[in-house]
Amino acid sequence: MNQDYMKTKPILPLVLSMSLPMVLSMLVNSLYNIVDSFFVARISENAMNALSLVFPIQNLITAIAVGFGVGVNAVIAFYLGTEDHKKAEDSMAQGLLLSAIHGIILMVVCVVFIPNFLKFFTNDPVVLKDGILYGRIAFSFSFVIQVGIAFEKIYQSLGRMALTMKIMIIGCVTNIILDPILIFGLGPIPAMGIAGAAVATGIGQTVPFILYLYYYKVDLPLRIHKEALESTQYYKKLYGIGIPATLNIALPSVLISVLNAILISYSAIYVVVLGIYYKLQTFVFMPSNGIIQGIRPLVGYNYGAKEYDRINKIYKLTLCLSLIIMIAGTLLCFVFPKEIMGLFTKNKETLDAGVIALRIISISFVFSSLSLTSGGVLEGLGMGIPSLIISLCRYVVIILPCAYILSSLLGPTGVWHAFWITEVFTAVISLLIYKKKKKDSFNL
């Protein structure tokens, strides 16, 4: 198993070869999110509202899987960089075991407590019924989500981006095909409504899980050993990176829930608008997030190999690529806001409110590229806490007080302005944190 190309191949071709498969797969995943919302919106406005309210918990489950997977990825990549194959294998085995445990716990907790969560935001019996039905089905697949994503991050740590791209695309396409069939029915298959959307999502997540089990048997160069499963040697290192990374990804769920609580006091329309925006934001941000996923193992490997100058070059290139993507996203939202929002709602009030929200919030995209890049590189270096500080600024410390104060002055529009104000301040903080850690760690 030779990963030397990670420290010898020219930077631009290396980053592109690692990132483009991830960008493509993340774009397909974003398309799934949009298609899912598109079909649910055709059921009713209440169904879309229910989906918007359940989304933060779904995001939390995925955040735990991806966040802990980032820890697994970083630890394995680091040990591969130091050429310690056994430690890479042992950390992989313990990472998979912990992911399985996370999945079982999340499934039980989320299925039991979803009614209480939804009642905090709405008393509408139809929305409650739809939300509980959708949530309980979707949460039943928590185990396959956790273990499947752990396998994905393991393969990414080995530089096997093309394989993870293919598997993710297969899962997403499965979901997209099943959505209209299970929601509206086809031939002998009955219409299941919002429950069909949840089942389609679950099947789309199970297919990659099964494929990863198959490829582990025939293709993975790292193996699971019984003695590694009986040890806790790498738990601290895995959680030391995984917990901050999980919080980084989970914090948007906290933000959405708090903003929903602020917006619902004005109208349920604004809750729907926020839910639609986050689906659209996923589409805009996923290319940048795909690049970040691609460079994490590069950063970890080069850090283990003490190739510090290459890490700095990777950071600068990633920032430039992210800026280009975010500028394009901002232009789309400014020029075509009505057309974009119109894909998800025909309600005139919701459409008008969404156009205003999209134009204001999209100002923040360009500034967010600095925060995303800095946080991603820091995670690749195994520096979870500094990355978490950046995310806390983006999703809690600055935006929540800002949204509360501005909403009291400007109404719902104040919440939208809080996004770009937060990103401006966080961009400055991110740059300062990264420069300090760079100086402390490798004197560049």
Identify what each model region corresponds to.
Residues 1-19, 76-143, 189-243, 299-364, ...:
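Short alpha-helical transmembrane segments in multi-pass integral membrane proteins
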Residues 27, 31-49, 118-125, 181-192, ...:
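Helix-terminus/linker motif at the lipid-water interface of multi-pass membrane proteins
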Residues 48-108, 112, 145-164, 260, ...:
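Small-residue-rich hydrophobic transmembrane alpha-helices
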Residues 60-63, 107, 175-180, 209-213, ...:
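Hydrophobic transmembrane alpha-helices of multi-pass small-molecule transporters
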Residues 69, 138-156, 164-172, 197-210, ...:
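Short runs within selected transmembrane alpha-helices of multi-pass transporters and secretion channels
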Residues 17-36, 137, 171, 204-208, ...:
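Transmembrane helical elements of multi-pass membrane transporters/channels
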Residues 22, 26, 38, 74, ...:
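Transmembrane alpha-helix boundary and packing residues in multipass membrane permease domains
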Residues 6-38, 42-43, 59-71, 75, ...:
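N-terminal transmembrane alpha-helices
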